[in-house]
């Protein structure tokens, strides 16, 4: 379970990858533009947890062919990128403070690892290994459960039919899970779904049916007053066919930053939440949340073992006036004199600069940093 800001860091474990919802991505354009927003915490459901089977409007007897769902093209990585760390045992030992732990000379991934994950995620981790071969052991230690190809394939088959409904439910479920334990979130979600038993839509929660619920009914399942407002607003937007977030054409034509803008207009959804939605629901391969505590801690541990990488980043940033100006601002995470942290936060400017070396697969790099952020790596993904 992932919590932000409201729980002790010792108990903060980034396991978003076990509780989100995956479906086929949509091909989009590459324009840019970004609006900032406040962070909120959320957890995304597994594909098997999403209610499906919405009653469709009766047809007039004329069937229309269903458009084929297009998978998002995997971005092309730069040709022959210079490695951050050379792909040799001697170099890994020299440039890091860890043993290489059986890094194969050809940097291949185990077949079972390849079979488990989606093609896009595999390309992402391959690129990360190409940039830094010393990441190989941490990558292959466990599967990244949020990027399993089976769940991806099952959802891809009917993605366009239920996509907007699933987008709505994923966002509502993220609000339910904000600032509560995993057990509490599961309990509240179960009670929320039980509200719809016996309704016109059967047991399937929908945006329209949610709007028909009174505030008292929604409060009765354990939602706070602010969360009730968030759920109602998200449902109001997704019940309106004229809204951008209910249009598949919008998701196909908009850039990820433009989608962030629309998501951040929803009550209860901030930029951090929008980025998690982009990674785990839309399967974006180049998302990076530098303001995430797990990312900050993972980067600190990554650089603690690779001090020359930080030194090189500082030298490169020194030649960039805009980044030098940004360095004058206080970093998102910093240690106070009485801090009990066992790790030293790195300034956001350096975190972003180093992450840029893993474009266009920063989502995979972020998952690796989350894994590195765990004090006891053996408990990873075994909650």
In which residue ranges do the predicted regions lie?
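Surface-exposed beta-strand-to-loop junctions
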Residues: 167-170, 211-213, 275-278, 344-347
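Phosphate-backbone recognition surface of nucleic-acid-processing proteins
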Residues: 280-355
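Intrinsic disorder/low-complexity segments, especially N-terminal tails and targeting/processing regions
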Residues: 9, 15-18
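Alpha-helix capping at helix-to-loop junctions
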Residues: 198, 236-244, 265, 279, ...
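N-terminal polyanion-binding entry modules of DNA glycosylases/AP lyases
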Residues: 3, 17-252, 317-319, 323-334, ...
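Residue-level marker of regulatory loop/turn positions in helix-turn-helix DNA-binding domains and
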Residues: 164-165, 169, 251-255, 266, ...
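Catalytic DNA-binding helix-loop module of base-excision-repair DNA glycosylases/AP lyases
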Residues: 176, 254-303, 364, 370
């Amino acid at each position: 379970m992932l919590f932000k800001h409201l729980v002790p860091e010792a108990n903060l474990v980034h396991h978003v990858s076990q509780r989100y919802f995956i479906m086929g991505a949509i091909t989009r354009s590459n324009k840019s533009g970004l609006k900032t927003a406040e962070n909120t915490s959320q957890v995304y459901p597994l594909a098997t947890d999403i209610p499906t089977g919405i009653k469709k409007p009766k047809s007039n007897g004329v069937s229309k062919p269903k458009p084929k769902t297009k998978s998002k093209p995997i971005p092309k990585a730069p040709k022959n990128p210079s490695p951050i760390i050379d792909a040799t045992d001697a170099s890994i030992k020299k440039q890091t403070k860890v043993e290489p732990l059986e890094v194969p000379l050809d940097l291949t991934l185990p077949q079972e690892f390849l079979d488990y994950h989606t093609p896009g995620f595999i390309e992402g981790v391959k690129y990360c290994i190409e940039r830094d071969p010393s990441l190989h052991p941490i990558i292959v230690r466990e599967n990244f459960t949020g990027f399993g190809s089976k769940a991806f394939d099952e959802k891809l088959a009917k993605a366009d039919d239920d996509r907007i409904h699933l987008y709505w439910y994923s966002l509502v479920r993220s609000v339910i899970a904000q600032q509560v334990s995993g057990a509490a979130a599961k309990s509240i979600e179960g009670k929320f779904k039980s509200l719809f038993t016996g309704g016109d839509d059967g047991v399937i929660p929908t945006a329209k049916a949610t709007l028909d619920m009174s505030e008292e009914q929604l409060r009765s399942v354990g939602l706070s007053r602010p969360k009730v407002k968030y759920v109602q607003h998200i449902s109001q937007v997704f019940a309106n066919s004229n809204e951008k977030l209910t249009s598949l054409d919008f998701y196909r034509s908009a850039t990820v930053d433009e989608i962030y803008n629309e998501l951040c207009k929803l009550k209860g959804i901030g930029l951090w939440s929008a980025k998690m939605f982009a990674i785990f629901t839309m399967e974006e391969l180049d998302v990076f949340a530098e303001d995430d505590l797990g990312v900050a801690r993972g980067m600190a541990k990554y650089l603690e073992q690779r001090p020359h990488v930080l030194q090189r980043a500082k030298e490169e940033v020194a030649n960039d006036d805009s980044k030098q100006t940004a360095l004058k601002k206080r970093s998102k995470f910093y240690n106070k004199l009485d801090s009990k942290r066992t790790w030293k936060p790195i300034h956001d400017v350096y975190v972003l600069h180093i992450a840029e070396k893993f474009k266009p697969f920063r989502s995979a790099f972020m998952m690796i940093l989350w894994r590195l952020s765990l004090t006891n790596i053996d408990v990873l993904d075994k909650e």
